[in-house]
């Protein structure tokens, strides 16, 4: 597995799902997944949600430093421009992600009535490995999002909205079946992009944007 992730998950008792298990799960949602694919969700990821955010952050940080050492680390906006990595802090993330209690997939950002799940509850309900389809990241800048899909058109979400605004937008039928990114998904997505394209993700100090990761809320 990438950077030993599969082995670490196996050590926790989380065996990677078989191809037939993933295919069966996707068949059960075939109509919805076909619609989402037409709407631009074409990247498949098998996310090791059962790993801790701290472990995933370290794996991603180590991978960034390795790429930098090998002169294979480039900017998000331009794959020809070398990226100036802060090797002392390769992953710039709020420390609360590793220390605070997280509510996953909250229905609303309300401290007493968020309707979210703990990590253990998510694993119990849907497993420690999450098979997901994601759209191109980052999302378009404000005012330039396209409408994709013929049978069920979907307007791409655009940058420069608040977390509450995005959460409200996801209630619209055109965004059926969609959820915000979790930190675990973001880290694995960023790691995958790094290994495949040698590029960083969401470089907010450059030409990228901060990712809100709506799938995680701190009540």
Positions of the model-derived regions?
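Short, well-ordered surface patches within globular domains
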Residues: 182-188, 192
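Short acidic-hydrophobic catalytic motif
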Residues: 1-178, 191-219
